[in-house]
């Protein structure tokens, strides 16, 4: 009786729950999963090299960082479900302590884009905001964008999400940033950028980090 009931329930499944021929083909394609694993390892290698060059840059820089900042802390993360897509990222420099954050995240978001972002909250944020205004033209025009999202963990780009940091937007950006206890400035690049094919992700990340240093200098 239990088996009959179970079978009866199975036969009531909606057809949209069945695998399509294309979906079956993907599930059966072992090369697809092997290729995915190769890509994961290659991206990790690129992020590890980026960590190495960022560590070198950090050791040569005098920056306004939280008192308990530890330059040895680093985080490599791999996941599957950032809006249904895989992702890999490096956090370095990395500082998360309660409501205090000062972290540079390098994110490879499969199916979307590369994102290099400086994330700051609490601590020296007031000085970082002042540096943003005082040194605006050292930061503007470099392909950076200010996040408009109410959360630091939104990674989309474009209208309603980000505002490009261009020389003609100083007053507008200063007004947006005024009074904020946290903010994020990011550079977005398509995944088909030539640098991805040429293994230059570490170069892009380092250049973005350097472009943000005026925010962090005393």
Task: Please give the residue ranges for each predicted region.
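Short glycine-rich, low-complexity/disordered patches
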Residues: 54-72, 141-155, 215-218
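Phosphate/nucleotide-binding catalytic core
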Residues: 11-14, 68-77, 110-113
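Aromatic- and glycine-enriched beta-alpha-beta binding-site module
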Residues: 81-141
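Mature, function-bearing regions of proteins
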Residues: 33, 37-40, 52, 65, ...
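Long, solvent-exposed, polar/charged low-complexity segments
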Residues: 11-58, 161-218
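N-terminal amphipathic/basic-hydrophobic helices that include classical n-h-c signal peptides
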Residues: 1-9
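A structural detector for beta-sheet-dominated domains
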Residues: 93, 147-149, 188
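Short, internal acidic amphipathic alpha-helical interface segments
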Residues: 123-178
